[in-house]
Regions:
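Mg2+-dependent phosphoryl-transfer enzymes with acidic/Ser/Thr/Gly-rich catalytic loops
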Residues: 1-5, 9, 21-22, 197-280
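Active-site phosphate-binding/coordination module
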Residues: 18-129
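A generic structural signal for well-ordered alpha-helical segments
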Residues: 32, 94, 178-179, 254
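Short active-site oxyanion
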Residues: 36-40, 59-60, 160-162, 223-224, ...
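Short, structured coil segments at secondary-structure junctions
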Residues: 57-58, 66, 179-182, 240-241, ...
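Short hydrophobic/aromatic-enriched beta-strand-loop microsegments
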Residues: 59-66, 184-188, 246-248, 262-264
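Conserved acidic, metal-coordinating active-site core of Asp-based
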Residues: 108-226
Length: 280
C-alpha cells in the first residue's frame, strides 16, 4: 500500500491527561512504522518539552512550537524565533499585568517568578497540598515543573520560539487586542490554565505552515497524509492534510472541521484509527 505520513499532536492526543503515551498507541505506531509509514510530532510544545516517553516512539521528526520549529531525522529544516526587542516589550507587558508566563526555546523552558506556585495552585483547585489528593494532583504536572528554569540570567532572548502565559488578572481579549496584529495568538490551548490564558507565537506561523514546508522539503503530496488532534491549534493542521482525525475529547471547534472522530487517547483512539486506515 501507499506509505502514509502521520502528524500527531501531543497533549490530549498522543498523550492522555497524565501526559503518558497509552500502550495501545505505542504498539500501533510501532507496527505502522515497521510497515514503512512515517510519524511526525506536530505540537505546540517546544523541543525542550518533549518527554523521553514520547521520544522513545519511532519518529521521523517533529514540528514543535506550534509550527515554529521543524526537524526531519535530526536535521533542523525550520526554526523561527522572536525578534529580541519585541519579545522584551511583550515580557514587560506580561509583568506589568501580573501575568505568569514561560518562554519556550530549544534550550529549555524559562519561567516567570511565580509561575511554579501558580501552576501548583491551579492543579490543586483548593485541595490542601499536604493531603493525599493534593500530592497526587501535583504529581500529574511534576514532569513539567521539573523542566522549568527559574534563572533569568540563563535566558537567550535571541532563541525563543513561543511564549505561553497563565492569566487570571485581565481578560484574554485585552492581551489579544494588544498583540494580535504583531503575534500569532491562540487562546486557552491548555484548558486547565484557564480561559484567559494562551500562547503567543510568531505571526503567521502555525501547524499548517510547518506541515506545508515539511512536505515540500520531502517532496511528498498531502494526499498521503493524516493528522490526529484535539485542540483549537489543530484546526490549521487539519487544513494541511488529507484526513484530519479528531480525538473523542476534542474541542467543538476541531470536531466541526474533522473528517473523522476516533476514541479518546486512553481508550485506544489512535490505534483504532490507524487500524481503520490499514496502517497496522
Amino acid at each position: 500500500m501507499t506509505k502514509k505520513i502521520v502528524f500527531l499532536d501531543v497533549d490530549g492526543t498522543l498523550c492522555d491527561d497524565a501526559g503518558n503515551v497509552p500502550e495501545s498507541a505505542r504498539q500501533a505506531i510501532t507496527a505502522a512504522h515497521k510497515k514503512g509509514h512515517g510519524f511526525f510530532l506536530c505540537t505546540g510544545r517546544s523541543k525542550a518539552e518533549i518527554t523521553e516517553d514520547v521520544l522513545a516512539l519511532p519518529l521521523s521528526g517533529m514540528i514543535g512550537a506550534g509550527g515554529g520549529y521543524c526537524e526531519v531525522h535530526d536535521e533542523v529544516i525550520l526554526h523561527k524565533v522572536f525578534e529580541k526587542e519585541a519579545l522584551l516589550r511583550l515580557i514587560d507587558f506580561l509583568k506589568a499585568n501580573q501575568i505568569e508566563y514561560y518562554l519556550e526555546s530549544n534550550q529549555g523552558l524559562f519561567a516567570s517568578t511565580n509561575l511554579r506556585n501558580r501552576l501548583i495552585e491551579i492543579v490543586l483547585a483548593g485541595e490542601p497540598v499536604e493531603s493525599e489528593t493534593g500530592k497526587q494532583r501535583v504529581q500529574t504536572i511534576q514532569w513539567f515543573l521539573d523542566l522549568l528554569i527559574e534563572d533569568e540570567a540563563k535566558i537567550d532572548y535571541d532563541d525563543v520560539n513561543k511564549v505561553s502565559f497563565i492569566n487570571h488578572s485581565i481578560p484574554y481579549e485585552q492581551v489579544h487586542d494588544q498583540y494580535h496584529e504583531q503575534f500569532q495568538m491562540i487562546r486557552s490551548t491548555v484548558p486547565v490554565f484557564g480561559k484567559d490564558s494562551g500562547e503567543i507565537g510568531i505571526k503567521n506561523i502555525h501547524k499548517k505552515t510547518a506541515i506545508d514546508f515539511l512536505l515540500n522539503h520531502l517532496g511528498i503530496d498531502n494526499k498521503d497524509t493524516l493528522a490526529f488532534g484535539d485542540g483549537h491549534n489543530d484546526v490549521e493542521m487539519f487544513e494541511a492534510v488529507a484526513t484530519g482525525i479528531a480525538m473523542g475529547n476534542a474541542c467543538e471547534q476541531l470536531l466541526a472541521v474533522a473528517d473523522e472522530v476516533t476514541a479518546r487517547p486512553e481508550d485506544g483512539g489512535i490505534a483504532q484509527a490507524l487500524q481503520k486506515h490499514g496502517l497496522v
